[in-house]
From Swiss-Prot:
The gene is ecpE. InterPro entries: Ig-like_fold, PapD-like_sf. This is Probable fimbrial chaperone EcpE. Coiled coil: none annotated. Residues 1-27 form the signal peptide. The lineage of its organism: Bacteria, Pseudomonadati, Pseudomonadota, Gammaproteobacteria, Enterobacterales. Part of the ecpRABCDE operon, which encodes the E.coli common pilus (ECP). ECP is found in both commensal and pathogenic strains and plays a dual role in early-stage biofilm development and host cell recognition.
Amino acid sequence: MFRRRGVTLTKALLTVVCMLAAPLTQAISVGNLTFSLPSETDFVSKRVVNNNKSARIYRIAISAIDSPGSSELRTRPVDGELLFAPRQLALQAGESEYFKFYYHGPRDNRERYYRVSFREVPTRNLTKRSPTGGEVSTEPVVVMDTILVVRPRQVQFKWSFDQVTGTVSNTGNTWFKLLIKPGCDSTEEEGDAWYLRPGDVVHQPELRQPGNHYLVYNDKFIKISDSCPAKPPSAD
């Protein structure tokens, strides 16, 4: 279970690794950092945008993980279970293209998680003199981590909400996002976003009070309380 302060923020699951300690004003863009492969399909696409002023090469590395989080266990995916194409992309400044992911694993009732790392590599090696006299790269390699969730082929989207105790439970076998906004006129920044995996439970006093509370599942909003007029927030 993950908590995100500010329902419009998706800072979790993002890791930017630089070979040079310099600010990254422009870099790779991949959209939402958590994306899902629906139960009824076998492939999903992810758009990559080159926001730099020069060309870049993009490559992918995939690890199977037991569950997203700081203590996750990474393993090599079973051969042929999750494939992607193309092997790499070469994009000029401002260009974009798609990587496609193909799932050929078990068609059961278990949800599976993969950490997908997008690696952005400069096509040229520009250097400058460091204060110590050596040379350092002025165009760093950037790695952005995302999470791909393969929903169960036999999916069960189930949940429960107890307003008396302020509890939302994921009683199914696939993840969803819970948006909690205290009060009917609160801003996006005042809300919280929780990512609930199967079996996760959220206890929050705000859930006992009037507010705009939603579940987000497959990009659809599900209002779980009737205390405020319906006005879906952003899913980002």
